[in-house]
Amino acid sequence: MLKSFCILSVFMVLFLAKFPDLCSGEEISPLKIVVRNSEYLNNPCNGVTCPSGYRCSIVDKQCIKKEK
């Protein structure tokens, strides 16, 4: 009985270490992924703000000069 409890405890610790969201008490939601994707689409240049006269290109993933 004690041996099986120890084995179960080890597996539970390994499981929680693999999925840290489960031990934080937060719900796992697919909306987090959507938020991350929308943040990426709003600024695909890895968080870099483009200088004045330039815009961030989704295709090139870099700042390019705005066309007039």
From Swiss-Prot:
Which residues make up the pro-peptide?
Answer: 26-36
- Establish whether keyword Cytoplasm is in the entry: no
Q: Respond yes or no to whether keyword Signal is given for this record.
A: yes
Question: What outcome is documented for mutating residue 61 to A in this protein?
Answer: 2-fold decrease in potentiator activity
Q: Which domain of life is it from?
A: Eukaryota
Grouped into one coarse class, the protein's main location is secreted
An example Gene Ontology molecular-function term = ion channel regulator activity
Mutation effect (residue 60 to A): 15-fold decrease in potentiator activity
Q: Give UniProt keywords alphabetically.
A: Disulfide bond, Ion channel impairing toxin, Secreted, Signal, Toxin
- GO CC term, one of those recorded: extracellular region
Q: List the signal peptide residues.
A: 1-25
Tissue distribution: Expressed by the venom gland.
Region Highly charged C-terminal region, binds to TRPV1 channel, as annotated, extends over: 55-67
Instruction: Indicate where this protein resides in the cell.
Output: Secreted
- For this chain, the annotated S-S bridges are 45-56, 50-63
Q: What's this protein's family per the entry? A: Belongs to the scoloptoxin-04 family.
Q: What is this protein called?
A: Tau-scoloptoxin(04)-Ssm1b
